[in-house]
Amino acid sequence: MIKLGIVMDPISSINIKKDSSFAMMLEAQRRGWEIHYMEMNDLHLDQGIAIADTKVVQLKEDPNGWYEFTSEQTIELAELDAVLMRKDPPFDTEYIYATYILERAEEQGTLIVNKPQSLRDCNEKLFTAWFPELTPTTIVTRKAEKIKAFRQEHGDIILKPLDGMGGASIFRVKENDPNVSVIIETLTNHGQNYAMAQTFVPDISNGDKRILVVDGEPMPYCLARIPAKGETRGNLAAGGSGEPRPLSETDLKIANAVAPTLKEKGLIFVGLDVIGDKLTEINVTSPTCIREIEAAFDISITGKLMDAIERRLQAQA
């Protein structure tokens, strides 16, 4: 029997209709795996050995009570076959410390999804810089004058911090926006922080598509997040609405261009954000949208993920 750990935000406060981590655990349970639940404060190092206080959890698809802990124990993380790192951003120093603890278990043979080093290496906004031919025209800088020159050149641009999630602090700045200086000051913290500027992709009105890639294989369906009226952000957290749809040829082309690099880096479960024919983000920390896609189409994305984990465990054995 496979022992699967999961590090996540408190299970008591998830929305089971939308939560991808819950979907993953349900699939693991269906396979008879033993699921060890952890939060960040359950991870420790003791003389270089990764230790975890875990709770074995049973799940049911019931909005009145979706989980029950059946036992609690302190174990070496390496006793688990695999661990899903599903803690939501912020990607802060605490998150980074947790990846080091997970890496110690990885060195003893535990499969960590996604690979700790790659979680540190692949910032969700910046990692797209490795695929410039697929992205909107982009600069990353702290300097206000560079951002202003970029806007001068391109007219309609998007400004965003490198560490936001759910559409937080994303600004659209048009040609004669009187607020441009204060937006730049806010985002760069008066030149102390890097910010990203990108050309605006008008196709956002048709949705910001979330494409899931499992162990190098793009899933054939995506969730298009349509911005609320008058909004430029499709994120569900910013009031967008989700519309599951099959991948277009362009979507598939973009996903196939990125997928081999993801697989090679041990990024087994990744969410690509695509607007029109442009890649805007590569989400590696805890991508979501499984539930919405699985509800609309005859596909088990979680099944494919657990198959990939089984394959990798067999290859390691």
UniProtKB/Swiss-Prot annotation:
SUPFAM superfamilies assigned to the protein according to its UniProt record, in alphabetical order: Glutathione synthetase ATP-binding domain-like, PreATP-grasp domain
EC number from the UniProt entry: 6.3.2.3
Keywords from the UniProt entry: ATP-binding, Glutathione biosynthesis, Ligase, Magnesium, Manganese, Metal-binding, Nucleotide-binding
Cofactor dependency: Mg(2+); Mn(2+)
GO molecular function: ATP binding; glutathione synthase activity; metal ion binding
HAMAP family xrefs: GSH_S (MF_00162)
Stated name of the protein: Glutathione synthetase
Organism name: Vibrio vulnificus (strain CMCP6)
